[in-house]
């Protein structure tokens, strides 16, 4: 059964401007430990790839927070939710700490879809309850 649905669109140019103003502090605030490694790797290769990665993760976390109905209120936080790719390339949501506990207690599972173009990143998240 569907528990919640969330979507978000992010202007990659705004992410670039924020990074320019605040440096890596913005990325370090939004990304979890494994995400920050991927961000730095992609950004070192091609700046635009790093920006797209950060924007899609920002967008996905916004969409996820909407789908679970908490917004960015505890136990939801930027770093307690990581969007990491499976070996197949499929994005998957990995939760940590109190958010992981909250999610498991409700027997929820999440599905995420990401896409980006030159100026925009969008995300769609469906959260459903697991069958009893």
Curated annotation (Swiss-Prot):
Q: Which GO terms describe its biological process?
A: fatty acid biosynthetic process
User: Which GO CC annotations does the UniProt entry carry?
Assistant: cytoplasm
Keyword vocabulary terms for this entry: Cytoplasm, Fatty acid biosynthesis, Fatty acid metabolism, Lipid biosynthesis, Lipid metabolism, Magnesium, Metal-binding, Transferase
Q: Which residues does the annotation say bind Mg(2+)? A: 8, 62
Q: Which domain of life is it from?
A: Bacteria
Q: Name one GO molecular function term.
A: magnesium ion binding
Enzyme Commission code(s) on record: 2.7.8.7
Its required cofactor(s), as named, are: Mg(2+)
The catalysed reaction is: apo-[ACP] + CoA = holo-[ACP] + adenosine 3',5'-bisphosphate + H(+)
- Alphabetized Pfam families for the sequence: ACPS
Q: Where in the cell is it found?
A: Cytoplasm
HAMAP family reported in the protein's UniProt record: AcpS
Q: Which family does it belong to?
A: Belongs to the P-Pant transferase superfamily. AcpS family.
Record's function text: Transfers the 4'-phosphopantetheine moiety from coenzyme A to a Ser of acyl-carrier-protein.
Protein name, please?
Holo-[acyl-carrier-protein] synthase
Q: Which organism is it from?
A: Leptothrix cholodnii (strain ATCC 51168 / LMG 8142 / SP-6)
């Amino acid at each position: 059964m569907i528990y919640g649905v969330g979507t978000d669109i992010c202007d990659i140019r705004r992410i670039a401007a924020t990074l320019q103003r605040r440096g890596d502090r913005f990325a370090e605030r939004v990304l979890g430990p494994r995400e920050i490694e991927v961000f730095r790797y992609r950004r070192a290769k091609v700046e635009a790839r790093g920006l797209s990665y950060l924007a899609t993760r920002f967008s996905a976390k916004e969409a996820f927070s909407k789908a679970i109905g908490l917004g960015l209120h505890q136990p939801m936080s930027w770093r307690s939710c990581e969007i990491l790719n499976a070996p197949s390339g499929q994005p998957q949501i990995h939760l940590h700490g109190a958010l992981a506990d909250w999610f498991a207690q409700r027997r929820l599972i999440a599905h995420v879809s990401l896409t980006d173009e030159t100026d925009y990143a969008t995300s769609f998240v469906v959260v459903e309850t697991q069958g009893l």
